[in-house]
Design a protein with these regions (language model features):
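Serine-dependent carboxylesterase/thioesterase catalytic core
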Residues: 63, 105-198, 214
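Active-site catalytic motif of lipid deacylating hydrolases and related acyltransferases
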Residues: 24-36, 47-122, 295-303, 307-314, ...
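Extracellular/periplasmic catalytic domains that process cell-envelope and extracellular macromolecules
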Residues: 51-55, 82-83, 117-119, 144-148, ...
Length: 435
């Protein structure tokens, strides 16, 4: 949401109000090129039969933090949509979504574009938890995707952050990157909701539970999941507004609750968002949504919980930096993160075949906890750890551009690029310092 600040300036006896410029990119600025390699983006999307030249809007399923699309949706939404003849695709994020949600946004952008191109029509999006806010990130910073989306249905989405994340990261530092970004005071949340929360031409249905133990506050229409303004058609509805006795919690509202599924189907079957009055009482007498097998439910739900609790990512002592493309001052089309970016350097002489060893440096008192290495645009290494000091990269191409991205324990992100010239004879190994 755009904030207008009136500043009182007394100069020559004149009271002059001024409007502070927003630090975030305007909503109509074209999005940057995707930084994630195309091969990884393609591999992240799994689709049902019928997606090509679809007869009706296909649904993009976006999972919550800690699980893949298969782990969350294979036992509920996937079979339920298939039973209704609705094609779908599920997108999965690196590290099960525990890492930087800005990167996850690129996966959703690719999924939207791919599904729109294959189906030949506008798509719908259903997301649970993080899966509710990351699609909004894609729509906010890649404007071309807005014309490709008809409906956005979110379940327990922390659209304005969660005080649970505030408390968790405040008590048990360090936290995973996505946890820091889910705090109500995070830069990610501020950027997500900058200028406007919705966009014209898209229908938004946000479903939440008052008994959600993870995403709060969520007691009424002013809670974190609810959206307001911006031009999109919006329905914000608590599960308990439809079924007062439904006490579903965070996982359930997005994976097996009948009210949430009924809201999704209502939004898909009608113009505009879901209308709670059309849902009737049928969801209130059902124990599970369609697609859930009551016999295997205990095992299916337990497997999802196990996957969620066992998923891990690096941990930081604070929120990582925002991507440059989110800021008003960034050059249009730039996708780099705000942080230290070293200029491109060229290794002197030539390097013989073998392994390049890179020494990773950071500020005194800090340490590198994550590193990614790209060779000619293709990611060849992704490593996390408590203290990373060196990495090794195979140098097979005669000439290569190597880009190294590190993230420190304190959330500082650095990027350096080095061009390496190969030769038939020469040093089989070289040491290149990463500034």
């Amino acid at each position: 949401m755009r904030r207008l600040l009136l500043t009182t300036i007394l100069a020559l006896g004149i009271l002059a109000p001024t409007v502070a410029a927003s630090p975030f990119a305007p909503v109509d600025r074209p999005g940057p090129a995707l930084d994630v390699p195309a091969q990884q983006l393609a591999a992240s999307l799994q689709c049902s039969p019928g997606i090509d030249h679809a007869m009706r809007a296909p649904v993009l399923l976006v999972p919550g933090t800690g699980v893949t699309a298969y782990q969350e949706f294979s036992w509920n939404y996937e079979p339920a949509l298939t039973q209704r003849g609705i094609p779908w695709c599920g997108v999965s994020f690196p590290d099960s979504g525990n890492d930087d949600m800005q990167i996850n946004g690129e996966y959703v952008v690719n999924a939207i574009r791919t599904m729109h191109a294959r189906s030949g029509r506008r798509i719908a999006i259903y997301g649970h938890s993080q899966g509710g806010e990351v699609p909004r990130w894609a729509l906010r910073f890649w404007p071309d995707t807005r014309a490709m989306v008809d409906d956005v249905v979110g379940a327990a989405g922390p659209n304005h952050g969660s005080i649970v994340a505030n408390a968790a990261c405040g008590i048990r530092k360090p936290c995973q990157p996505s946890d820091w970004q889910t705090a109500t005071t995070s830069h990610f949340i501020a950027a997500l909701n900058s200028y406007q929360e919705t966009f014209p031409g898209i229908s938004y249905t946000e479903v939440y539970s008052r008994f959600d133990e993870e995403v709060q506050p969520n007691q009424n229409d002013t809670g974190t999941s609810s959206l307001h303004g911006g031009g999109g058609q919006i329905t914000n509805v608590a599960v308990q507004d439809v079924c007062p006795n439904d006490v579903v919690e965070h996982l359930g509202v997005g994976s097996y609750d009948p009210v949430t599924f009924a809201a999704l189907v209502d939004a898909l079957d009608h113009d505009g968002p879901a209308v709670p009055a059309r849902l009737g009482l049928n969801p209130c007498i059902q124990r599970f949504m369609p697609g859930v097998n009551p016999v295997t439910f205990p095992t299916d739900a337990a497997n999802t919980v196990t996957a969620l609790e066992s998923s891990q990512s690096m941990e930081l002592n604070g929120e990582g930096p925002l991507a440059c493309y989110t800021t008003a001052s960034c050059a249009a089309g730039s996708g780099r993160l705000t942080g230290s970016v070293a200029p491109t350097s060229v290794t002197s002489g030539c390097v013989g075949p073998g392994t390049l060893r890179f020494v990773l440096h950071t500020e005194r008192g800090d340490r590198v906890v994550r590193v990614e290495v790209y060779v000619d645009g293709r990611r060849v290494l992704h490593r996390t750890g408590r203290r990373l000091s060196k990495v090794r990269v195979s140098a097979r191409a005669p000439n290569a551009t190597i880009r190294i991205v590190t993230v420190s324990r304190h959330g500082t992100r650095r990027t350096s690029t080095r061009r390496v010239k190969g030769c038939r004879k020469g040093r089989p190994k070289t040491l290149v310092e990463h500034p």
